[in-house]
Amino acid sequence: MAKTVYIAGLGLIGASMALGIKRDHPDYEILGYNRSQASRDIALKEGMIDRATDDFASFAPLADIIILSLPIKQTISFIKELANLDLKEGVIISDAGSTKSAIVDAAEQYLAGKPVRFVGAHPMAGSHKTGAASADVNLFENAYYIFTPSSLTGKDTLEEMRDLLSGLHARFIEIDAKEHDRVTSQISHFPHILASSLMEQTAVYAQEHEMARRFAAGGFRDMTRIAESEPGMWTSILLSNRETILDRIEDFKERLDDVGQAISKGDEEQIWNFFNQAREQRQAMEIHKRGGVDSSYDLYVDVPDEEDVVLRILELLRGTSLVNIHINEENREDIHGILQISFKNAQDLERAEHLITENTDYTVVIK
């Protein structure tokens, strides 16, 4: 039976979610809320949604499922608003926030006793692009879509959500909200602090050591890429998960002090063990499997400095969807190849590797 889905927030995540729902459920009516007229117009023009509004409360009573794809503070504010609306009995309310405890706690506080169901959620996908204009039906492919059930989740809710979101081609997983926040503080939130701190430190250092800007490439670029993330979103994330993140900061300070002491003492064995353990631990992690934020599939090609060589590669890959192509101008040991090509899914990556290796003698490396 066709359902009515209401997505509040037509940014990259919300709009991409609408496309994924439409892919598997073309008969579902998708309603959209966004304050921006431009985002609403794009979503309507591209067929992501069927109707749009800038008045959140107006569409909520019509929905069988409501998804709040909004900043954390606004999500909590809208949960409070939903508690005072005449919603359909048994309506499912979910969200797409990057931290979960504050949102789940708010839902259990304000929606308790209401004839609704609530399940927290965090689709771990993203891009450096933003807005409805950047929506991508394949954004969530093979990425983790985390559910954090609450006391209001109820029977069959998760099954209904998995069915609704089947067109996202994501990997669904359930985890406790507090454990979610502990885990993401370490592997997502704290790394953003590190990247931004390293970038800020380098910018100040480069004022006296100008060549630092010119030499920054390879590993530095990889480590600081996420420093370009949207500051408002990350301010909200850190403040909604502050205790756990502060714990990670203190833990890191201790580890950094240990390394500093080893260097000061000239303890070669401790320094070697530090790097070797990190290398072994990284190799043992599932970090090379796709499932996290901003997933892409990268292929590196060592190409000669010849005219039209990039054009030749692109001709071979005609019909393959590329996310990005980058020419590494420096010949550095920490760069896998001169030409870096990024794909959205494993199928395109494998096809590209096959085409290039079969038709050229270039060395191809998959990272």
Feature annotation, model-predicted:
Residues 80-132:
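Rossmann-like NAD(P)(H) cofactor-binding subdomain of soluble oxidoreductases
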Residues 208-275:
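Interdomain hinge/lid region at the active-site interface
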Residues 281-367:
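A conserved regulatory-domain signal marking ACT and ACT-like small-molecule sensing domains
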